From Swiss-Prot:
Pathway: Pyrimidine metabolism; UMP biosynthesis via de novo pathway; (S)-dihydroorotate from bicarbonate: step 2/3. Heterododecamer (2C3:3R2) of six catalytic PyrB chains organized as two trimers (C3), and six regulatory PyrI chains organized as three dimers (R2). This is Aspartate carbamoyltransferase catalytic subunit. HAMAP family: Asp_carb_tr (MF_00001). Its EC number is 2.1.3.2. Belongs to the aspartate/ornithine carbamoyltransferase superfamily. ATCase family. L-aspartate binds at K82, R165, R219. It comes from Parafrankia sp. (strain EAN1pec). Carbamoyl phosphate binds at R54, T55, R104, H132, Q135, G260, P261. PROSITE patterns: CARBAMOYLTRANSFERASE. It comes from the Bacteria. The gene is pyrB. PANTHER family: ASPARTATE CARBAMOYLTRANSFERASE, ORNITHINE CARBAMOYLTRANSFERASE, MITOCHONDRIAL. It catalyses: carbamoyl phosphate + L-aspartate = N-carbamoyl-L-aspartate + phosphate + H(+).
Length: 309
């Protein structure tokens, strides 16, 4: 594995290797010294063309726990977000000798282009509405830790599927891992090509909840919308929000997930987000372990080992 650009690229063995490695990395968090020497002397660049606190910080902590040197590069504004400007940035990264570049970009496909311009490994940290592979991996890791398996589980993804890179990455990964995925959304918030996805589609949340092992709520992404996709926020919440009454329809063992940040009171009620079945806080903690695993698998080993491989 040279890059992590899309969960659609991951075979079952690849995905399981990341999850199993993340299990080992999670034990580092419980150790007296929460650090491994694995990536000492390697440089990881966090290249973020969109604002992000949660994901950028998670990657930074992950790299530092593996003893890598970390450079945070924040690029704001459209003048550096397309075409030659991205290529110029790639040339700068090459001059720095970056071993890995963690890239978040508003344009779908930007990390793929970057991967063709640099010799180091590229990790897609979210590109437009396309994908967010490490979010899907940490979601799968969280589900497996809570429920013990992924194969055969019924996972329901609810909300703004149209604009959600998290939904796309989860659909491909969870399907590869043997889960059955259903998406629930207003017709206006489903992508045109949804019929080609390996999912069932429903418009009735309450009918799906009793059959769900996992319910993953998505944030309504107003910043990516160019038109009104639903009448009002109140109407959206009434039809597709997860409140205490709807959560009571779920099986006792079922989990509630959210990639964050949440809009409390719209897509999810605080009483549900803070309930024992919620994994929201665990997802943040597990994100560090999963991103450690990804960086370890991409860069692990000494320079001599890499040159001889």
């Amino acid at each position: 594995m040279n890059h992590l650009l899309s969960t659609a690229d991951l075979k079952l063995d690849d995905a399981l290797l990341v999850l199993d490695t993340a299990d080992r990395m999670a034990r580092v968090a419980d150790a007296p010294v929460r650090k491994l020497p694995t990536l000492r002397g390697r440089t990881v660049v966090n290249l973020f063309f969109e604002d992000s606190t949660r994901t950028r910080t998670s990657f930074e902590v992950a790299a530092k726990r593996l003893s890598a040197d970390v450079i945070n590069f924040s690029a704001r504004g459209s003048s550096v977000s397309k075409g030659e400007s991205l290529k110029d940035t790639a040339q700068t990264l090459e001059a720095m000798g970056a071993d890995a570049v963690v890239c978040r970009h508003p344009a779908s496909g930007a990390p793929h282009r970057l991967a063709s311009w640099v010799r180091g490994s590229v990790v897609n940290a979210g590109d437009g509405t396309h994908e967010h592979p490490t979010q899907a991996l940490l979601d799968a890791f969280t589900i497996r830790r809570r429920l013990g398996r992924l194969d055969g589980l019924a996972v329901t993804i609810v909300g703004d599927v149209l604009h959600s890179r998290v939904a796309r990455s989860n659909v491909w990964l969870l399907t590869t891992l043997g889960a059955r995925v259903t998406v629930v959304a207003p017709p206006t918030l489903l992508p045109l090509g949804i019929s080609g996805w390996p999912v069932e589609v429903s418009y009735d949340l309450e009918s799906v909840l009793p059959k769900s092992d996992v319910v993953m709520m998505l944030r309504v992404q107003r910043e990516r919308m160019s038109a009104a996709f639903f009448p009002t926020e109140r109407e959206y919440s009434r039809r597709y929000g997860l409140d205490a009454d709807r959560a009571a329809l779920m099986p006792e063992h079922a989990l509630v997930m959210h990639p964050g940040p949440m809009v409390r009171g719209m897509e999810i009620a605080s009483s549900v987000a803070d309930s024992p079945r919620s994994t929201v806080v665990e997802q943040v903690a597990n994100g560090v372990s999963v991103r450690m695993a990804v960086l370890y698998l991409l860069l692990g080993g000494s320079g001599a080992e890499r040159e001889s491989s």
